[in-house]
């Protein structure tokens, strides 16, 4: 077991560095000028990670989990007479549908199997047939399985039909290179505790300025009013409307500096990619097969199908935890799977130690 207590092989919360943890040992004031300046630096750094055309975009930080930020977008961006098309092939796409329904937003769904990417042909057919659709939403990396969805094609199609594009990049932003201006993404949502390698406590929305300005007065919630949150941060030098997670913001700023030190998003992607390939190859040697086809597989998290025989996931989980690892159960309904993530402060030697623990018969006799 490491000094981190457990190595989290999960898609977030994840294993953070010692230095990210250490900055949370101090207390901070939400009204402090230096703290607000840090918030502004965080906002600017996120835009620069997202696109070269920085002047067209802005960042809104939102308290809570990433789901809070997704709901802030759904509830603030779509007008009362709007209609949302959601591309879904997993739990997080379904969650967007549920949000829309609870907010009384007209919604239509393009659904594929959980191990298949979004069907572009079906999406275009829906857009051709339903002229009332105003917005289209897609999850980039659906961590239900680890599949990557074709956001380039979805957003291109959305703009071809004049729609506002919403991308849930919760588990991909900072770990997979994305230029939101090139992809014509209007609103991208992610979270502090994913590929940037911070800790849970806030999410963020990188928004196309002109589209964000249209959201004034549209929010269906006070605390999740995306426009009002942005206007306060923008006009009051990084101030949050309500109490902000000061420790989490400091940890996130440190994580951003460490991302830069590592070599940026491309370098981090390469580490994640190599982790994932090593994981699949080593697990294959001991009889575990991945659920998702290699060409659709993300470098973020991998779903493995239960092997034949007397396999007990809970035994696997408990034994691995004894040896200092935490993994994820499966989240799909039609196939028995479990999931192993390889993002966070995770390296080749960690993947090898994990698989060695399994291969030695610790878990599987």
Swiss-Prot record:
Assigned EC number: 2.6.1.37
InterPro entries per record: Aminotrans_V_dom, NH2EtPonate_pyrv_transaminase, PyrdxlP-dep_Trfase, PyrdxlP-dep_Trfase_major, PyrdxlP-dep_Trfase_small, SP_NH2Trfase/AEP_transaminase
Pfam family for this entry, one: Aminotran_5
Keyword Transferase listed: yes
Residues with PTM N6-(pyridoxal phosphate)lysine: 194
Cofactor(s) for this UniProt protein: pyridoxal 5'-phosphate
Similarity remark: Belongs to the class-V pyridoxal-phosphate-dependent aminotransferase family. PhnW subfamily.
Protein name as it appears in the record: 2-aminoethylphosphonate--pyruvate transaminase
